[in-house]
Amino acid sequence: MIVEPKFRGFICTTSHPIGCKKNVENQIEYVKENGKIEGAKRVLVLGASTGYGLASAIVASEACDAEVLGVSFEREAKGKRTASAGWYNIESLKKFVEGEGKKFISVNGDAFSNEVKSEVIDLIKENMGKVDLVIYSLAAPKRKDPVSGEVYSSCLKTVGAPFTSKTLDFHTGEIQNITINPATEEEIEGTRKVMGGEDWMLWIEALKEANVLENGVKTIAYSYIGPEVTYPIYREGTIGRAKNDLEKTAGEITKVLKSLNGEGYISVNKALVTQASSAIPIVSLYISILYKVMKEKGTHEGCIEQIYRMFKELYEGNLNLDSENRIRIDDLEMAEDVQKAIEEIWPQITSENVFELSDAEDFKKEFFKLFGFGLEGVDYSEDVDITTV
């Protein structure tokens, strides 16, 4: 069938298999051009199908020549409904890696569940022995507590007071004012349960108990801080509370891994166009301005550039750590000259000048690329088989 983008709000409900494959190939090409990294050899990536998790799986496999086990929860094609972009991404990467004669194991299931943890541990024992790097990059709207069975939902709200600011509807290019209401205590706790560090710790404890962690193992979870203009909705909001919990967990994990000389890290990454960030009010406008400023300065990076740099710094003993022991790969975003330029543009921006003062057009293009649309070298008028890549 011919696949075109279809939308429900900020969610694209279709994905293009050949476009997703091309997107993965472009990232692989970047890694190959930039050379090998002497690092991890057996890697578990939790949340391996999109964004930073996908980039981590690609860098591990292609730069480090590591064996990779990737866990994700994606939708296969059914009837005339395409598979999710993440499903095509993982299939594309798996085919490519196996074509090179390397090992890539994929598990499609709920990483929050005990069942998937057990399945992954068995697969590590059978195929890899032990892992020396665990990447935690899960993003989900809900999580079922494996002990109590209670289902928790995450939400995107402020804490304490409502917050009004401007945001970008990137479909129309309109700048609108938006008010975000504060969360209840229950919503704050629900978001922490889904997006905090609890499940990361459960994974590390389960892997350690099963004796599948290598001596000197490292584990990294991804976070974001950003500038003050986004604080009320992000860092000081429900998501920020969950990220604080995630960051606190890194230190606790280092203690758990002490007997293995292991370490738990948080990597604070750059703001990028992802399925998650495009739905966050205010952040979409901030990213559009950020892209323009960083491109003009020649410092713009996407997921793959960020993660390649992080791996290189990690394994060459050159980590840029802050006072709280977090890896700062957001250093170029948070550079004083970049933030100053954004602060000057922010109050001036309107629906009339948004395309001149920001990279709103590119935000839209990058968003479409997440689902395999708008990539060079893909004929979108062709019939495609939606069940494979």
UniProtKB/Swiss-Prot annotation:
Gene3D superfamilies listed in its UniProt record: NAD(P)-binding Rossmann-like Domain
Keyword set, alphabetical order: Fatty acid biosynthesis, Fatty acid metabolism, Lipid biosynthesis, Lipid metabolism, NAD, Oxidoreductase
GO molecular function terms noted in the UniProt entry: enoyl-[acyl-carrier-protein] reductase (NADH) activity; NAD binding; trans-2-enoyl-CoA reductase (NADH) activity
Claim: NAD is one of the keywords in the record: yes
GO biological process, one term: fatty acid biosynthetic process
Sites marked Plays an important role in discriminating NADH against NADPH: E74
Record EC number: 1.3.1.44
Role played: Involved in the fatty acid synthesis (FAS II). Catalyzes the reduction of a carbon-carbon double bond in an enoyl moiety that is covalently linked to a coenzyme A (CoA).
UniProt similarity note: Belongs to the TER reductase family.
Protein name: Trans-2-enoyl-CoA reductase [NADH]
Organism: Clostridium perfringens (strain 13 / Type A)
